[in-house]
Regions:
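N-terminal hydrophobic/helix-forming segments and targeting peptides
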Residues: 1-305, 309
């Protein structure tokens, strides 16, 4: 499972450019399910009883945050705009890599503190950031084009105490969990149809969830994503959330209470540890889109780990 997650995190797939990760996931799922990639780039895998009256949808998103190239200046420095929610605090000196057939690495330029006048001690906004690929304009223009996408470069790493760190754990954790789910279900005879939707563009517009859920027309849905955990100075609802203490079941007025209660009931019955995430409104995940598809889909949200236990 760990190797699968590491493999997933090494693959590109910035919003709108999910082809590499879609292809990888489709190949994995095809071993267990009837799998296709639709015209929007969603991966759709069908298991269980194809003729059943009831369909349950399991969703995780393919895309990861990144950047789109907007201009290249005469010195070969590249300007970008964000694709998804970028925390500008992590950009200083970050290494980015182009999502192309021949990836090229560059570093985010920042003002050295020795040269700063004191007014540049805050994180620079995206529109003030330049990427340095270490090449003159002519060479950069050969390798980087306007509209190309970049993402954060970094190898998955194993930490102590069975912890890991990697780029794109949002939502490669969810994908790993659903691939494992497909493996466990396999060719089992079920009284209902299960459709796994690995959706595109969650980080930007939710296109994949909107169109995929419309096509699948499920009765019920579980969206699988990631959330926050306790760390120094964190207070409020996340202060008590801990790693390795089980997935978080979301409680929200826009979700189906019956579905959320069912998740809680099953977890207790099977002795699966879990935690709560209460949210007072929309969740910022694909569950928001899926729940209002067509005449409505009874939806719940699971913030999961890639542990087979969960």
């Amino acid at each position: 499972m760990k190797q699968l997650l590491f493999d997933l995190c090494r693959i590109g797939g910035v919003s709108g450019s999910e082809e590499p990760i879609a292809k990888f996931c489709a190949e994995k799922l095809s071993a267990f399910a009837d799998t296709t990639i639709d015209k929007n780039g969603n991966v759709i895998a069908t298991l269980g009883n194809a003729n059943a009256d009831k369909t349950i949808l399991l969703d995780a998103h393919l895309d990861r945050i990144g950047f789109i190239v907007t201009s290249i200046n005469e010195n070969g420095f590249v300007k970008v705009a964000s694709c998804g929610g970028i925390d500008v605090r992590v950009l200083s000196d970050a290494v980015l890599v182009s999502c192309s057939d021949e990836p090229v690495k560059g570093v985010v330029c920042c003002m050295p503190p020795h040269l700063s006048d004191g007014g540049e001690d805050k994180a620079a906004p995206i529109d003030k950031v330049w990427i340095d690929f270490g090449l003159p304009y002519e060479k950069v223009a050969e390798k980087i084009k306007i509209g190309d996408v970049l993402t954060f470069y970094g190898e998955p790493k194993e930490l102590m105490n069975n912890r890991i760190t990697a780029p794109a754990l949002d939502d490669r954790c969810g994908i790993a969990a659903l691939i494992r789910c497909a493996e466990l279900i396999g060719k089992k005879e079920l009284s209902y149809k299960v459709v796994i939707l690995l959706s595109v563009q969650e980080e930007t517009y939710g296109t994949g969830a909107k169109t995929g859920a419309y096509r699948i027309n499920a009765d019920e849905a579980i969206a699988v994503d990631v959330s926050f955990a306790s760390q120094p100075d964190v207070s409020g609802q996340y202060a008590g959330v801990e790693l390795a203490k089980g997935p978080m079941i979301c409680i929200s007025p826009i979700l189906s209470k019956a579905m959320s209660d069912k998740l809680i009931s099953v977890a207790k019955e099977k002795n699966i540890p879990f935690q709560y995430e209460p949210i007072s409104g929309t969740t910022g995940t694909n569950a928001d889109h899926i729940s209002v598809t067509k005449s409505g889909v009874a939806s719940c949200l699971l913030y999961t780990s890639p542990s087979p236990r969960d």
